[in-house]
Structures are given as C-alpha cells and as structure tokens.
Amino acid sequence: MSGNTYGKLFTVTTAGESHGPALVAIVDGCPPGLEISLEDLQRDLDRRKPGTSRHTTQRQEADEVEILSGVFEGRTTGCSIGLLIRNTDQKSKDYSAIKDLFRPAHADYTYHHKYGERDYRGGGRSSARETAMRVAAGAIAKKYLASQGIVIRGYMSQLGPIEIPFKTWESVEQNAFFSPDPDKVPELEAYMDQLRRDQDSVGAKITVVAEGVMPGLGEPIFDRLDAELAHALMSINAVKGVEIGAGFACVAQRGTEHRDELTPEGFLSNNAGGILGGISSGQPIVAHLALKPTSSITTPGRSIDIDGNPVDVITKGRHDPCVGIRATPIAEAMMAIVLMDHLLRHRGQNADVRVSTPVLGQL
C-alpha cells in the first residue's frame, strides 16, 4: 500500500489500523533546535480523542503519545521523529458479523477490490483512527510555525442544517462542538440528542484559518498552495469538499465583488482566502471542509456480501454520529503540515529574495 506519506521537505508517514496494537508516525524534515514536549503534542490529541462527550464515539482511547526518536533533552535533533500511540480499547468482536459483508458507503467494497484482503475490524487502515497520528505530527508543525509568527486555528461553522456564526476564538475551546458561538451550543446539543434517538448521523462544515503567513508560500504550477491544501484536507476521512476563501460562492459574485482590492493600508476583502496565483498573499489563509454523515449507523441498509448476494447491514460498534465534531484539530494539523512543508521549500529556494513593496494586511 502506497500513499502513506505527505510532504516533500517536511514529511509525515503514518501506519497502523483501527484495531491493531498501535499507530505510528515518522516525521522527517523538522529543523533542529525546536523546543518540543509531550505536552505540546498531547494538547491537540486531547482535543481530538474519542469519548470526551456524549455526542462522540464512546470508544475510550487515552491517545497518549510517545516520542521514540528525534528529540533529545526537549529539543529536536534534526533526525527523524518517531511517534507512537497505543490502541487500548478495541472491541473487535463488534465487527465479526460483517467480515463477509460490505457496509454501505464505507471503504469495505473498494479495499476488497483493490487488495483482495481487508481488515474488517473498524475499517482497518481506512478508519479515521489513523488521524490521531496526523494530529500528533501536526502539533510539531504548529509549534514550529508559531515560532515564525504563524497561528492556525479552526472551528465548526455548520452542523447539519444549523449554521454557526463566528463570534470569538475563545468560545471554540469551551464546548464539545468547537463552536465559536456559545449561544448555539444548546441548539447543537438538542439536535444531536434527537439524532441519536433517530439512530442516524449528520454532516458538518469545518473552517480552518492560518494567520501570520508571509507572502510567497506556494509553488506554481502543480504545487500551488491552494491545490496542496485541498489535497491534504481532502485526504481526511469523510471530507467530500474543500473551499478556499469564498469558494463556490464566487459563482454568484461579480468581478467587482470578488476581487480583493489593494490600498496602501491593506486589502479590502479576502475572497481569495489568502492565496493568489497559488501563492500566499500575506492575508489569513481560510479553508472550509465539508464532511459527510458517517455511514456507521444502526438503521439497516441494503448491501451485498462478498459473493454478491443481497443483505441488510446493521453496523454495530461505537461510532461518531457526526464525525465533524472531532475534525477541527485534524484540519488544523493538515493545514499546519502543508504550510510547514511550503515554508521550508520557500526558504530553500527564495531565502535571499528581497522586495521593497510593503507586506499588506487586511483592513
């Protein structure tokens, strides 16, 4: 199986399955001398881990990360950073009834046709359990980017039909939904409680923002920064759409509305989402992710078995009724990994570039 590594100068390779003994990651390319601790990584892992509220899966994983290499006396050495998270709460027997069936809208059917073999326990490699390692690796990238003045934060901007207006960043960390509007939390809780009673699931929209990014990151033509972000964010389980800036709303805009005009004081808008011609403009980089409703629900669904016979499938086990609730730190991690990679690439080729034009912010 290929496709387990992302990046060119800052690379992240992950391995492990949902019900295997552990998840592992190798992070290469981190500059030496970065102060890093287990707490730096654990902070984001705790934001993602399961079982933290009644609105997420009740699988109880501590997600305690171990640093195996690449860090000595609290500082990165420049060598490969090895990371490990042990799985501790697998209940593989929950999946024995579906080992010869294909769950609708899961990767069971496609993995079977591609490999001829599949780990049916919790989806194996296709499970979102893998994203714990992305969050751990992304925490390293976030720590380095922060030292360069770059801050990456995300929030839930929609759950099912409920749109969530942005109010404050402080509110995001004070509820289980990563909602920036505390007044919306009771409505979100009531909606999720009813959803659970209906034995159904729902999708969500996540917004992730990077502030403090200097102009110049991104490599035309095929490694445009927005293309790389879309690639990385689309690689997250259940993501079915990515928008940069105004995204699909630009279809209804006129050029006079959409263009981000410049003044000596700064940009007048940010419809481009901080990226022009595939290169960062110095404005905040803004991306939106659409996550589908999980198909792991107890309502029966039609499918087939490995012999092609029709069956009704009821998915047992412990699942998120809305995978978007825990997706915010994952989206932050993937944006951080992309920006870290491009920062190092930009520095390698363009470190000596100097222009007299001032860097503009947004009014």
UniProtKB/Swiss-Prot annotation:
Co-factor binding details: Reduced FMN (FMNH(2)).
Entry keyword annotation includes Flavoprotein: yes
S-S pairs: none
Entries under CDD domains matching the protein: Chorismate_synthase
Catalytic activity, EC: 4.2.3.5
Record GO biological process: amino acid biosynthetic process; aromatic amino acid family biosynthetic process; chorismate biosynthetic process
Residues involved in NADP(+) binding: R48, R54
Signal peptide: none
Reported cofactor(s): FMNH2
Residues noted as binding FMN in the record, renumbered to the chain: R125, S126, S127, N237, A238, G277, K292, P293, T294, S295, S296, R318
Gene3D superfamilies xrefs: Chorismate synthase AroC
Highest taxon, organism lineage: Bacteria
GO cellular component, one term: cytosol
Pfam families: Chorismate_synt
Pathway per the UniProt entry: Metabolic intermediate biosynthesis; chorismate biosynthesis; chorismate from D-erythrose 4-phosphate and phosphoenolpyruvate: step 7/7
Catalyzed reaction equations: 5-O-(1-carboxyvinyl)-3-phosphoshikimate = chorismate + phosphate
PROSITE patterns the UniProt entry points to: CHORISMATE_SYNTHASE_1, CHORISMATE_SYNTHASE_2, CHORISMATE_SYNTHASE_3
Keywords per UniProt: Amino-acid biosynthesis, Aromatic amino acid biosynthesis, FAD, Flavoprotein, FMN, Lyase, NADP
GO MF term list: chorismate synthase activity; FMN binding
SUBUNIT field: Homotetramer.
Role summary: This reaction introduces a second double bond into the aromatic ring system.
PANTHER family with a match to the protein in the record: CHORISMATE SYNTHASE
HAMAP family given in the database record: Chorismate_synth
Family: Belongs to the chorismate synthase family.
Protein name: Chorismate synthase
